[in-house]
């Protein structure tokens, strides 16, 4: 009896291993945009990029407190909660890219070569969850097979 289910168990283990190898979740070390890591301090961002073009602080129910937004020009925005970067958005080709070198204007093929198949596609958004925390990750908005916008950090 035992000999009959051992091959099934082995086949199931192989299938499970293959499924996890194919997962596209990214490590937290991939959550970097423009040299700024998820969780970087606002002070560090100012050291790297200087004084923001605009600073706005407002109450945000999601984070149950104040959120401070830094804008650099009209295409690079960072949101800080308690002084730490929780969301970065790049909305135009401005030389700012991810740790894997993806920037606005990169091809969808380049995104997939860097990160694999997305964990989820929602409309024109290709979503890659962080393997340690599914509430954070990378989102690439794709228009005409090119990256039109990049979001990094909290995905809510």
Language model regions located:
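Sec-dependent N-terminal signal peptides of Gram-positive bacterial secreted proteins and lipoproteins
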Residues: 2-24
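Membrane-targeting and insertion segments and their boundary/processing signals
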Residues: 11, 81-85, 89
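Detector for Asparagine
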Residues: 18, 64, 94-97, 144-145
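Acidic/histidine-rich, surface-exposed loop or edge segments in extracytoplasmic proteins
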Residues: 24-31, 86-96
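A cross-family detector of function-defining hotspots
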Residues: 25-26, 32, 42-84, 103-155
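Short, surface-exposed ligand-recognition loops at beta-strand->loop->(often short) alpha-helix junctions
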Residues: 36-38, 99-104
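Short, solvent-exposed aromatic-acidic interface loops
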Residues: 90-94, 151-156
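Hydrophobic transmembrane alpha-helix bundles
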Residues: 93-101, 126
């Amino acid at each position: 009896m035992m000999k009959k289910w051992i091959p099934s168990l082995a086949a199931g283990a192989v299938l499970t291993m293959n499924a996890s190898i194919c997962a596209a979740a990214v490590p937290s070390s991939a959550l970097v945009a423009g040299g700024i890591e998820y969780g970087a301090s606002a002070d560090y961002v100012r050291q790297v990029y200087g004084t923001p073009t605009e600073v706005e602080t407002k109450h945000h129910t999601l984070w149950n407190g104040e959120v401070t937004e830094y804008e650099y020009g009209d295409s690079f925005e960072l949101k800080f909660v308690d002084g730490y970067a929780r969301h970065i958005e790049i909305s135009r080709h401005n030389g700012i890219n991810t740790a894997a070198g993806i920037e606005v204007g990169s091809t969808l093929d380049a995104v997939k070569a860097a990160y694999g198949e997305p964990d989820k596609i929602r409309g024109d958004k290709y979503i890659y969850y962080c393997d340690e925390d599914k509430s954070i990750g990378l989102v690439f908005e794709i228009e005409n097979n090119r990256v039109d916008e990049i979001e990094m950090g909290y995905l809510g």
